[in-house]
Amino acid sequence: MGVSFSKLFSNLFGHKEMRILMVGLDGAGKTTVLYKLKLGEVVTTIPTIGFNVETVEYKNISFTVWDVGGQDKIRPLWRHYFRNTEGIIFVVDSNDRSRIAEAREVLQRMLNEDEIRNAVLLVFANKQDLPEAMSAAEITEKLGLHSIRQRPWYIQATCATSGEGLYEGLEWLSTNLKNQA
């Protein structure tokens, strides 16, 4: 009984660590999201060729966030980051209507991978500060999110440069990752 109680106590009050994979098309704002969460400031970025990894602390949880480059030629490498991934953050450029179908295809293909079948999905509808940005509801439809039945998912409107919506997304992740444990 002591072991059960200590595990329960740890689950309720202890410090958790969670592995998060952040992906999306190139130019969606993944690296800007990562460093806004980590440093609280906007950093100058260049296209990510490999990956960035940082630990973001939020509400007694250490999120180890792997930000992986989104260029077409790099996407096949994403699968090398799938092992032990508990949550996926898929970042979408809400202002880029010309690539939303490509984003849907990439997301659907990735979600079919067996190694991440138990990972929860958070979609950041990024760049909401731009006047032509699609709403979270429109992106939900265009990505076909309502057809996802095998995992918990959530979409959050965000603006990585201001930080708007980022912590709301982490809040959803922390709640849903606790439920998975």
From Swiss-Prot:
Binding site for GTP: 24-31, 67-71, 126-129
Keyword Cell division: no
Lipid-modified sites (N-myristoyl glycine): 2
Subcellular location: Golgi apparatus
Biological processes annotated in GO: intracellular protein transport; vesicle-mediated transport
Gene Ontology MF term list: GTP binding; GTPase activity
Keyword check for Transmembrane: no
GO CC, one annotated term: cytoplasm
Chief location category: Golgi
Pfam name, any one: Arf
Gene3D superfamilies: P-loop containing nucleotide triphosphate hydrolases
Keyword annotations of the record: ER-Golgi transport, Golgi apparatus, GTP-binding, Lipoprotein, Myristate, Nucleotide-binding, Protein transport, Transport
Family: Belongs to the small GTPase superfamily. Arf family.
Function in brief: GTP-binding protein involved in protein trafficking; may modulate vesicle budding and uncoating within the Golgi apparatus.
Record-given protein name: ADP-ribosylation factor
Organism: Eremothecium gossypii (strain ATCC 10895 / CBS 109.51 / FGSC 9923 / NRRL Y-1056) (Yeast)
